[in-house]
Amino acid sequence: MRNLIFEEPEGIPGNSSSSLRYAWQSIRAPVIIPLLKLAVIVCSVMSIMLFVERVAMAAVILIVKVLRKKRYTKYNLEAMKQKLERSKKYPMVLIQIPMYNEKEVYKLSIGAVCGLSWPADRFIVQVLDDSTNPVLRELVEMECQKWIQKGVNVKYENRRNRNGYKAGALKEGLEKQYVEDCEFVAIFDADFQPDADFLWNTIPYLLENPKLGLVQARWKFVNSEECMMTRLQEMSLDYHFSVEQEVGSSTYSFFGFNGTAGVWRIQAIKDAGGWKDRTTVEDMDLAVRASLHGWEFVFVGDVKVKNELPSTFKAYRFQQHRWSCGPANLFKKMTKEIICCKRVPLLKRLHLIYAFFFVRKIVAHWVTFFFYCIVIPACVIVPEVNLKKQIAIYIPATITILNAVSTPRSMHLLVLWILFENVMSLHRTKAAIIGLLEANRVNEWVVTEKLGNAMKQRNNARPSRASRFRIIERIHPLEIIVGMYMLHCATYDLLFGHDHFFVYLLLQAGAFFTMGFGLVGTIVPT
């Protein structure tokens, strides 16, 4: 056998393209093909794991719909309300609004919360303002004073530091002396606007069942029509609430706190050890620990709280990094604690580790990116690797349909949603790896930018000559590189292939280029 390392084989052309071709051929059989076959096997296993999980959740939802019995419907809400009104024993409720430089939306949440129809002497509004802008801090405090003059018990709290970020603010808020008499705490992010009857539709569950530690409401998106990116986000989040959260609640297994639009029993927070800032998903961290202490949760899908989706691609990327990195990091930190916990049944612990964390927070991201964006395109240019259509086409198609049925009004956007989610899987995969390895960006906390009415005001105003779009800030090299790779594979399949994968590859390459050049979402002039 010719020594490819120390001897120069005869007949090797001298130009660079021929050298690259020779190098490719020399490693193709001994290295590329075995590695690609292994990757296909691993990705196929992950696809089947995700498929089984999605089908199982779909079966639960089907049973729930057929029987018309969701977890919260076993309670008679109207009867519980009447019982509370007759007794006049209204519990003291703390309402926390954490915010950080939320100049576009701070009035929305403060105004909505102060307008809640609960006895005025039985709730405290706590505005936790970590803003670093002194002018904005003054504006927020003035807004609080306005509602104080109207008779609402509002407490404005501003820290000199941002230790612990949101978790730190919530923790310090609960330590205030005036909170000692509060039994429950409702939490709303700065862009959330609860309806006036929110407390009437959530607190009775906690009063009726002393084992309940959390009542989680659903999100309702006020700006889903703003651009195509917000419509596609709506599809993903609708699946999360209508399927993942509902299944966790209906099966008494586990579902995570969404960080906002929920009401906690303060004793449950104390039993769990309080808020911790060890990850960027302090809400999920608290929910897992409370669940391990035996507290139950209920998801009330009929209660919807208006809020805003991130409409700029930059803001959405930062949000998805936090939402993907944090769970992976928490999974690493809590696996041993979950396994060793004897207070909850073994089946619930297995569900928490395998289904909730491993499949939904790790496998779902990895299989989407590695299989659909790396391995399948590679199989096109290495036809020696057998890729079964059941794995490459039928299983992904079934998973996609199960995801999309939760938002029927957007079914016509299904293809765009697939392409969009595949591109975002690049960032989610990278973030999950960072979380597992605890790399340098593992605790990166960037508040998701919300535009509120800002874009309406900008659209109505005459654009300034000084306003410019910074092209360089809109270019994302990783997306462009993956797009070029998929375009190369698509071209090869178009010229030499026979499986017609080039149709998918061209569309997906176009999606990577579109997002790589920042041509998605709302573009805000600088």
Curated annotation (Swiss-Prot):
GO MF term set: glucomannan 4-beta-mannosyltransferase activity; mannan synthase activity
Active site: D130, D283
Membrane-topology annotation of the record: Multi-pass membrane protein
Pfam families reported for this sequence: Glyco_trans_2_3
Domain of life: Eukaryota
PANTHER family named among the record's database cross-references: GLUCOMANNAN 4-BETA-MANNOSYLTRANSFERASE 9, OS09G0572500 PROTEIN
Function: Possesses 4-beta-mannosyltransferase activity on mannan using GDP-mannose. The beta-1,4-mannan product is the backbone for galactomannan synthesis by galactomannan galactosyltransferase. The galactomannan is a hemicellulosic storage polysaccharide accumulated in the form of secondary wall thickenings in the seed endosperm.
Protein name as it appears in the record: Glucomannan 4-beta-mannosyltransferase 1
The encoding gene: ManS
